[in-house]
Amino acid sequence: MIRTRFAPSPTGYLHIGGVRTALFSWAYARKNNGVFVLRIEDTDLERSTPESVKAILDGMHWVGLDYDEGPFYQTHRFDRYKEVIQQLLDSGHAYHCYCSKEELEAMRAEQEARGDKPRYDRRWRPEAGKTLPAIPEGVQPVVRFKTPLSGVVAWDDAVKGRIEISNEELDDLIIARPDGSPTYNFCVVVDDWDMRITHVIRGDDHVNNTPRQINILKALNAPLPVYGHLPMILNEDGQKMSKRRDAVSVVDYADKGILPEALLNYLARLGWGHGDDEFFSMEQFVEWFSLEAVSPSASRFNHEKFMWLNAQHIKAADNARLAELIAPRLAAAHVDTAHGPAIGDVLALVKERVQDLNALALEVDYFYKKREPAAADVEKHLAGDAVERMGRFADRLAALEAWTAESIHELFKPFCADEGIKMGQLGMPLRVLVCGTTQTPSVDAVLALIGKEEVLRRIRG
């Protein structure tokens, strides 16, 4: 059975690169009727926080990527890691190293002075016929993995193709710190082994970790998963996305009024494609997805295209759901939709005009309360006899028996003819008086929804 995993470190927010990794891992499992596992890699005790764990879990819930197993926490598995470390020590695949911090710094300085690549010189590595230094007093050793001294580590990456790295490029990795706590690269190996992960789909910043992890798996006689390393997501300037310059957190996008399905849809298109299809559901994505179709090249985040896609998802969204999503925004603006037109009817009229939920809430508010118009709009559209003219139009509105967009529309042409004005000289003042803005859908439809009594009240002040 196919088993994939998403394994974030809780040292900050859930960023969009992580969401795309989770999405591709989730989709591959769903496509193949497999299992998707969530693992929290929290061995960095100084940087991992409960707040970050919550942000990850909340983010996964918001985007709707459901997991079949987990969340598993590495900090709950320390006994298992110690057991496997001892197994490697007993089998001769790991050893204790008593180098002090000062020795390692001196070693690095000497190597850099010679122009060599800084690396541990394996002085504590046991070999046949080699005499090890005397164990110093007061030094707690680390445990290092015995990396093969020759040969290559090779794997067929599901995204990048064949990758080969010489063991001569690798040093003897520390797998346990002086206090006995296991290190990241080691925990990952044990977790993937124990959790029977068949496909490791992750960012290409992990490519250099892969040969080290493969060597450890081989030393444990454990099966090797298929590795697939996803390319980086760049910003529009072609630079790595950063929290300072770019909206990269899931929370950022939620606050900006993005629909989760729109974010997933767009992230799916960053590095993967299905012909010319831009707008699709997650059900379609799962049906179409394959690792072979993932590009090994980095992708640029195009904000304009992303917002266009969010607009398409808003248009396609159920109005009842949209009402739920914008309810907190309306409440914060003291807009009460319980009194006034049916919110579903309002959303049906305005949702094609916006690109995000924040803008949608702004489009909705004037149906329930008049905005204070901008001074420039008042000066431009309500100067001279415009207000008196609107009063005369209100009288005609008041005489209507049927309050519909059609009956309201039928008043426009004869009124403009009687007043000797153009339609813009009626429509714009109406918008400013009734809605407090010049930007609305068709004014007859807006007036029909707001209701006769409220429209007359707003016009007549």
UniProtKB/Swiss-Prot annotation:
Keyword Protein biosynthesis: yes
Keywords: Aminoacyl-tRNA synthetase, ATP-binding, Cytoplasm, Ligase, Nucleotide-binding, Protein biosynthesis
A molecular function (GO) term: zinc ion binding
Main location: cytoplasm
Motif residue range(s): 'HIGH' region: 8-18
Enzyme class, spelled out: ligase
EC number annotated for this UniProt entry: 6.1.1.17
Motif ('KMSKS' region): 240-244
Domain of life per record: Bacteria
Alphabetized SUPFAM superfamilies for the sequence: An anticodon-binding domain of class I aminoacyl-tRNA synthetases, Nucleotidylyl transferase
Keyword match Protein biosynthesis: yes
GO CC terms, sorted: cytosol
GO biological process: glutamyl-tRNA aminoacylation
Recorded coiled-coil stretches: none
Function: Catalyzes the attachment of glutamate to tRNA(Glu) in a two-step reaction: glutamate is first activated by ATP to form Glu-AMP and then transferred to the acceptor end of tRNA(Glu).
Subunit organization: Monomer.
Family: Belongs to the class-I aminoacyl-tRNA synthetase family. Glutamate--tRNA ligase type 1 subfamily.
Name of the featured protein: Glutamate--tRNA ligase
Organism: Chromobacterium violaceum (strain ATCC 12472 / DSM 30191 / JCM 1249 / CCUG 213 / NBRC 12614 / NCIMB 9131 / NCTC 9757 / MK)
Phylogenetic placement of the source organism: Bacteria, Pseudomonadati, Pseudomonadota, Betaproteobacteria, Neisseriales
